[in-house]
């Protein structure tokens, strides 16, 4: 190799690599946790932490023989992709991606690709362009000469020393409890911003692969909690007619704020509006449900609604622990014909397995809808195809039945070709994202109306409870209005619970959690003989006024009304999931 070739991987190039890596780590911390690029000049301790981590990450560069130093491009490229991936993920799910999510290859499809591309922003060039500039600089260094003897131990030691120096500037803080700082994780993005890339990687990898079995003390503590702190009532005072059918609609990304909204004088959700009308009897309506999904996203919501448990804060329960057994809504509805219809392939989020775990007798997937020709007849719009499929399925069900349906049309991105045509797209009163989202909401609302019409036409409406819930948030109203997340209220982020066809009429304005839906449905269906009531509270029995979200375990709603049970439920749910094979229901 020529001297000119060797010199291109000398001190100057190493320094440039360190600066690029540190800048990328810093930008990612700004974008995901520290309020964005506007706070660039206020976070010098994070700059020091980023430099310390970049130096430590790249210091092995000096221990590699010169002819192999081109390998430095591998960590540089991977770091660039890693930062971009987490920035996009955080925009969708408000946290960094857990390592196990990288193994969810069954979820990779055109919808995921389109969703990811829609999350890219112009500021992401601040991560990508430095790598491009480094490539250009490397090409321009052909004639530059630096003579270093091998092995380059001295530069390696200097790199470590510089890393320690910058680490001292960034990490040393007289008021910091270092054990708590480095050994406790109250949110991935917060941990990363406070501690940097390498501590974050080490801590989260350790958490991902630590022992998944309970100690005897943990099992005894869990049993005490389940026996003493969980409800055990058996009465059915809120249900006058037993053995009704149940249709559970889990609607993708449905917020409460579009309900009742008009655009250019027309209702966005006429069907849902009619259901929640104040004069409509036999309807429970809770507009301020707090989403409690974690890294499993939609699958976490399915898990909560079907089991009454809370998901893992540090993994994807449907994939890593989807085999059960768990107590389930279908288990409480003993003797029911239990079916599930989804718009996606069964492999997505491990739904082929979880459908059995949740007690479903039959799962119908995207393949079934396509084989029936419903996608072709409805221009590929998922919810319309699913409703058409359900219209033929309903007459075949044995009563009483439990039919769970999971919609998909309202999944991001809201781009041309994926958004159904409507007058909403022509309105100039909202931004493009809101117009696309509301067009999808309008289509799904009409599909719900078609399902209700089918129930009425088949003579099933009077014997059927229809529960409509949402999996998680997507388009906050405060963002549509141009306000910040710090100005968000329950009206901006709330997702709805609507239960129609029951014996109770209730409008519940307080904040509740998704985990409170399970026991509420047990009350509505009159199946409290089932021993498991979930980790939430039925809003027909208890004055729930707040809930805890998993990102940083913050209380949303009235913190003074929160019970010790609600505060402890996340930890005990994790123990329950890990100990599920030692339990029977």
Regions from the language model: what does each represent?
Residues 167-249:
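Membrane-interface segments at or immediately adjacent to transmembrane helices
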């Amino acid at each position: 190799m020529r001297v000119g070739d060797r010199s291109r991987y000398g001190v100057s190039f190493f320094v440039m690599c360190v600066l690029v890596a540190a800048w990328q780590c810093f930008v990612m911390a700004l974008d995901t946790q520290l309020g964005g690029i506007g706070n660039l000049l206020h976070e010098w301790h994070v700059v020091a932490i980023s430099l310390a981590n970049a130096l430590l990450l790249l210091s092995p560069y000096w221990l590699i023989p010169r002819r192999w130093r081109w390998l430095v491009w591998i960590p540089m490229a991977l770091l660039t992709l890693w930062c971009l991936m987490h920035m996009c993920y955080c925009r969708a799910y408000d946290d960094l991606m857990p390592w196990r999510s990288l193994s969810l290859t069954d979820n990779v499809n055109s919808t995921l690709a389109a969703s990811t591309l829609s999350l890219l922003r112009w500021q992401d060039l601040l991560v990508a362009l430095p790598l491009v500039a480094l490539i250009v600089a490397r090409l321009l260094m052909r004639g530059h000469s630096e003579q270093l003897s091998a092995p380059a131990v001295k530069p390696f030691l200097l790199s470590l020393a510089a890393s320690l120096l910058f680490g001292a500037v960034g990490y040393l803080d007289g008021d910091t409890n270092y054990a708590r700082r480095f050994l406790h994780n109250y949110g991935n993005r917060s941990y990363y911003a406070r501690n940097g890339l390498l501590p974050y990687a080490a801590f989260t990898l350790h958490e991902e692969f630590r022992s998944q079995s309970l100690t005897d003390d943990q099992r005894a503590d869990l049993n005490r909690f389940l026996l003493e702190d969980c409800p055990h009532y058996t009465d059915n005072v809120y249900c006058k007619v037993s053995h009704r059918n149940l249709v559970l609609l889990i609607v993708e990304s449905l917020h409460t704020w579009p309900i009742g909204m008009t655009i250019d004088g027309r209702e966005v959700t006429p069907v849902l509006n009619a259901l929640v009308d104040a004069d409509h009897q036999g309807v429970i309506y809770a507009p301020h449900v707090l989403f409690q999904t974690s890294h499993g996203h939609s699958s976490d919501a399915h898990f909560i609604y079907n089991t009454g448990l809370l998901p893992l804060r540090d993994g994807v329960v449907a994939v890593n622990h989807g085999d059960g057994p768990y107590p389930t809504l279908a288990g409480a509805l003993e003797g029911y014909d239990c079916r599930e219809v989804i718009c996606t392939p069964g492999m997505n989020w491990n739904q082929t397995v979880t459908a059995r775990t949740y007690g479903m007798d039959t799962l119908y997937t995207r393949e079934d809808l396509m084989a029936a020709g419903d996608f072709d007849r409805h221009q590929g719009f998922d919810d319309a195809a699913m409703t058409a499929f359900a219209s033929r399925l309903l007459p075949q069900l044995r009563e009483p039945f439990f039919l769970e349906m999971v919609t998909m049309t309202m999944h991001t991105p809201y781009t041309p070709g994926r958004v159904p045509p409507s007058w909403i797209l022509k309105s100039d009163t909202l931004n493009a994202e809101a117009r696309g989202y509301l067009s999808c909401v309008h289509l799904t609302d009409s599909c719900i109306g078609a399902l209700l019409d089918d129930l009425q036409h088949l003579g099933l409406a009077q014997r059927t409870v229809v529960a409509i819930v949402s999996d998680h948030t997507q388009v906050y109203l405060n963002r549509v209005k141009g306000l910040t997340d710090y100005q968000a209220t329950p009206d901006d982020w709330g997702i709805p619970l609507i239960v129609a066809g029951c014996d109770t009429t209730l409008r519940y304005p307080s904040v509740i959690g998704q985990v409170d839906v399970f026991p509420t449905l047990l009350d509505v269906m009159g199946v409290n003989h089932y021993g498991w009531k979930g980790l939430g509270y039925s809003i027909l029995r208890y004055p729930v006024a707040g809930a805890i979200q998993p990102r940083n375990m913050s209380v949303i709603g009235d913190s003074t009304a929160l019970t010790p049970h609600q505060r402890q439920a996340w930890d005990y749910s994790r123990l329950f999931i890990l100990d599920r094979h030692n339990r029977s229901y």
